[in-house]
């Protein structure tokens, strides 16, 4: 991984599929407000193709509209975590926090059509293109087996934070996540 820098970071929230409007879903708007209160710029806007979250649509949007670059921190939740990982195969970012990440389509056709799972993951490139990688996993996630998160953590060397929540991190706030981001960006 790259050495951690202390320049001002921008946070980009990459939601799970189906989370639209984004500001009414889960902890996304709460995180944006909380970061703004701490002086951190945060992009939290509706994604194109919000239900299927196709890689061919999301990655150009993240690069071109969200302006992902070497000073951005990606916060990817569920499908957004997979989008973050695929983006980091080719794009340098400041870091990423992956929430409820997986590495397979779990045998679910609607996940397979997203395009994230149709080839091997480039784990080494992901690591090389980020200064830090943190991962939150629910040991009792109703959608993603915990073993999926462990596989991602083992391949990326993430700082794996495991919680027993049974909710796929689908809550209205997420104080631990805010604390993690602030610690990683040096604020």
What is the role of each PLM region?
Residues 142-148:
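Conserved alpha/beta-hydrolase "acid-adjacent" motif
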Residues 45-48, 161-167:
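Short glycine-rich catalytic loops that host catalytic nucleophiles or stabilize transition states
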Residues 129, 134-137:
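Short beta-strand/loop motif that positions the catalytic acidic residue
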Residues 75-84:
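Gly/Ala-rich beta-loop-alpha elbow adjacent to hydrolase catalytic centers
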Residues 7-51:
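Short, surface-exposed "cap/lid" segments of acyl-processing enzymes
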Residues 53, 166-176:
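Catalytic histidine-centered segment of alpha/beta-hydrolase-like enzymes
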Residues 173-187:
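Catalytic active-site module of serine/aspartate enzymes centered on a nucleophile-bearing elbow/loop
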Residues 16, 47-50, 97-106:
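Active-site nucleophile loop of the alpha/beta-hydrolase fold
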